[in-house]
């Protein structure tokens, strides 16, 4: 969602520094490894930081028109995010994209193991009674592509800059969300 449907707004280095997490360490995994008392306080701090960013979210160019086009063509749309679900809802609302997703179609770290674990994709596939071979995971980061690979769905790497850093984990590359309507048939 962040960096895919919405313009990238997270400075993860700054967030790690605010949370006193070592540079380059995945944030959720670092919190999971902390002693419980520190982990709880760090989760609350992370939530506050993420919520502030969520309220400032802006959509990617063509996000709304692409989602509307895909829905009109019968595609099922879902969100799998490493954010908490209330943060995802705030992000979608601020970006003007809430209307494209039901609550059940927005899955965050409070409902499943975080990406790259494929559990959230499996939940969406089950909800839709869909087959992995006719599904895709669209994302801008390695965790998105790994989750898609781990679930055996098509992986779509979105990078407006054209920096496709993980070709071995990518089935389709796009630089604009509007390309999805052509790429997904």
PLM features: what roles do these ranges have?
Residues 2, 76, 154:
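Residue-level detector of anion-binding/catalytic polar loops
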Residues 58-62, 83, 140:
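Short beta->alpha linker loops
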Residues 85, 91-185:
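Asp-based, Mg2+/Mn2+-dependent phosphohydrolase catalytic module
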